[in-house]
């Protein structure tokens, strides 16, 4: 099986349209990358943590018996995005799996974190450097929801705290919490590949001994066996499962424990907040690029 990558370099205000366009044409995934080697610094109020120039990459799966007409696809894209630079490349499976290593650079998240590919040296040795090899699991710091969660963790007192990372993906949030002093992190994801990636990334950062990660059923058994409740919970998934999980999260977090939810777009904030207000005090709603939002607050004093 082969893969086709279409790389389109656009301005910040064209990202949403370009991403939607690529997905509507059958892309199996879309990624965003810095086009001009800019640091992703902590934004001022009203600003967004997205680069001015962005490479939007659509990934298409090619069937050997029905190959994609690349020129026809590019012609259509160029009609929708006139005078916009774009290029394509076709990758075999083995090359595609690690192709991003050729151009992946450290990413600065605010002023506290650097996300550093495992094969590169950290740009700032004294910063909180998260070594990462996400493979195909979600969560590299590029996406707005991951940024919002990292930003929140960086401002939260995690010293000697018990933390839950629900929907851990690559493990980036679990690792960040441990590097910031969490006593223990319990992480879970429905994807076995994410569980493996989280273990590998925790090992890369020398924090594996303070991490438990498993599929949800395994996680539930392990966490209940611990006899504790979490001081902090972070969940970067989607609005629908977040609303379904609200009663369960209320049992996992101790009274006055802190939480942050992401993977929510602006239009979903009211619905999610309404469900969570039954169990939690909503203290802050933070909005970032392309309408992605974070809801944070504390568990009610009485369980």
Swiss-Prot record:
GO molecular function (one): protein-lysine N-methyltransferase activity
Pfam families per record: PrmA (PF06325)
Signal peptide: none
Organism superkingdom: Bacteria
The keyword Methyltransferase belongs to this UniProt entry's keyword annotation: yes
Entries under InterPro entries matching the protein: Ribosomal_L11_MeTrfase_PrmA, Ribosomal_PrmA_MeTrfase, SAM-dependent_MTases_sf
Keywords assigned by UniProt, alphabetized: Cytoplasm, Methyltransferase, S-adenosyl-L-methionine, Transferase
Protein residues bound to S-adenosyl-L-methionine: 146, 167, 189, 236
Classification via CDD domains: AdoMet_MTases
Primary subcellular site in the record, as a coarse category: cytoplasm
Enzyme Commission numbers on file: 2.1.1.-
GO CC aspect terms: cytosol
Function: Methylates ribosomal protein L11.
Designated name of the protein: Ribosomal protein L11 methyltransferase
Organism of origin: Acinetobacter baylyi (strain ATCC 33305 / BD413 / ADP1)
